[in-house]
Amino acid sequence: DRVRKLTAAREKKIGILLPTGSGSAIANLAVTLDQRISVNLNYTAPPSSVESAQKQCEIETVLTSRKFLEVLPKLPLVQNILYLEDLLKDISHKEKIQALLKAKLSPARFLIGNRPVLPDDIATILFSSGSTAEPKGVMLSHHNLLSNIESFRSVISPSRKDVMLATLPVFHSFGYTVTFWFPLLSGITTACHTNPLEAETIGKLTHQYKVSVILTTPSFLLAYARKIKPEQLTHLRYVFTGAEKLQPRIAELFEKRFGVKPLEGYGATELSPVCAISLPNVEIDNLPEIGNREDRLGRVLPGMAIKIVHPETTEVLQPGEEGLIYIKGPNVMRGYLNKPE
């Protein structure tokens, strides 16, 4: 409601500049429930990339925090900035009670109002870093995100008792879909920390909240293997990595220290982002089910199809041959922003 009151009706895209945590979660929820398009700005990218993302999306308003801006280098933001500190301070006790009752008791159609959300409506735009060229905006629809979440959920079968660690930034597709929306829509408790590099603090967090599922990058996983104590991860069930290649030495180091084998996934921002994932090897009725191999990226998620083709002839290649990857599925992006070609 507050976002709706403080922004113009013409503003379809709202910028968000916040680290992982309750603030970014609430901001993204507010924008999505108001049927706007969230644009989580990459605060680690060059200032020119942040400026480019705002211009491409024609952003007029950015949600952020004064405290967070104090620790960032100066970034070129639009003039209309809404600070979470101010928004929280202005919310009366009566409004809090009304919001609680609305969230607990109101049917979904009441929250949405007379503006139904269509599956192909754009939910978010995620940008590349823009380190070598102008950042590209990847447009992901509600259907893209929900289909990817459902496919991911069907293969890892999370429990309501699970607790997931969330440290990846929401401007990254892995953090946005897998460690923000996935646990939220699966009823899983999430333990958040703003900086994935602070391994010792994260170790205390995982112990305090009995974290059972970790989704992170191999680089961060290496830091955890070196600095987190084994007794801090006694409840750990699954570790999944993405965004970069999982080196065998990192997987072996982590498994030796904590007794849980990290499993590698594959994807891209354009795929919402998960496409394939390795799973634990299991045995059912004395029949082995192979879920992962060292020389493979894993199983394709349900609902998707992959083939490897020759880059010039598009002829389908045999297993083991190198070529272009063709991927088909409901998770494939709607396209690049302002680049219909």
Identify the function of each model-found stretch:
Residues 1, 104-110, 119, 138-159, ...:
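Conserved structural elements of the adenylate-forming
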Residues 2-45, 167-169:
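Conserved AMP-binding/adenylate-forming
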Residues 2-6, 33-100, 112:
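Structural core segment of the AMP-binding/adenylate-forming
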Residues 32, 146-163, 171-212, 227:
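Conserved AMP-binding/adenylation subdomain of ANL enzymes
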Residues 58-60, 76-89, 163-165, 191, ...:
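Conserved helix-loop-beta element of the AMP-binding
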Residues 82-89, 94-127, 133-134, 157-163:
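Conserved pre-ATP/AMP-binding loop-to-beta segment of ANL
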Residues 211-216, 225-292, 305, 314:
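Gly/Ser/Thr-rich phosphate-binding loop
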Residues 303-326:
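Conserved beta-loop-beta connector loops within the AMP-binding
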